[in-house]
From Swiss-Prot:
InterPro entries: CcmE, CcmE-like_sf, NA-bd_OB-fold. The lineage of its organism: Bacteria, Pseudomonadati, Pseudomonadota, Gammaproteobacteria, Enterobacterales. GO terms for molecular function: heme binding; metal ion binding. Belongs to the CcmE/CycJ family. This is Cytochrome c-type biogenesis protein CcmE. The gene is ccmE. Disulfide bonds: none annotated. The chain crosses the membrane at residues 9-29. Keywords: Cell inner membrane, Cell membrane, Cytochrome c-type biogenesis, Heme, Iron, Membrane, Metal-binding, Signal-anchor, Transmembrane, Transmembrane helix. Residues 140-164 are annotated as: Disordered. It is found in: Cell inner membrane.
Length: 164
């Protein structure tokens, strides 16, 4: 092998090793920051074809509805627990902190935290989901003041209010 080919081979090997090392380090760093999304049924019965359940200590996000009657608050601290359910089961979520204003029993919620024993998720963050038709009270009042008829009545008219 002539010296020119030899140097190109060494250069190609160094580049491949560098790319492999970089990819490995990036995947290792991301592994601790990846939060998989689970429903309560997937936590209880497994996710996917292989029915993989989350490991104890795994970071995850759980989404579902807050079970009516399951919210329990500690009167002295900000600690609370509630159950999140779907059609296939319910999982207990514990949280310490102030909940979002839209958090209610029977409402959708997404909790991000760590899976623990006893099918419990220790949440670090709780996000309340709302109906896409939700309108803040201020906007609703403004719409009532500015629009005396429903939006459907405005279809088929031009900007002057005359029928098209």
């Amino acid at each position: 092998m002539n010296p020119r080919r030899k140097s190109r081979l060494y250069l190609a090997m160094v580049v491949l090793i560098g790319i492999s090392l970089t990819t490995t380090l990036v995947l290792y760093a991301l592994r601790s920051n990846i939060d998989l999304f689970y429903t309560p049924g997937e936590i209880l019965q497994g996710k996917g074809e292989r029915h993989e359940k989350p490991a104890i200590g795994q970071r995850l996000r759980i989404g579902g509805m807050v079970m009516p009657g399951s919210v329990q608050r500690d009167a002295k601290t900000l600690e609370m627990s509630f159950q999140v359910y779907d059609a296939r089961g319910a999982v207990t979520v514990t949280y310490t902190g102030i909940l979002p204003d839209l958090f209610r029993e029977g409402q959708g919620v997404v909790a991000q935290g760590v899976f623990a024993e006893g099918n419990t998720v220790h949440a670090k963050e709780v996000l309340a989901k709302h109906d896409e038709k939700y309108t803040p009270p201020e906007v609703e009042e403004a719409m009532k003041e500015n629009h005396s008829r429903p939006a459907a009545a405005y279809r088929g008219t031009n900007t002057t209010g005359n029928a098209l």
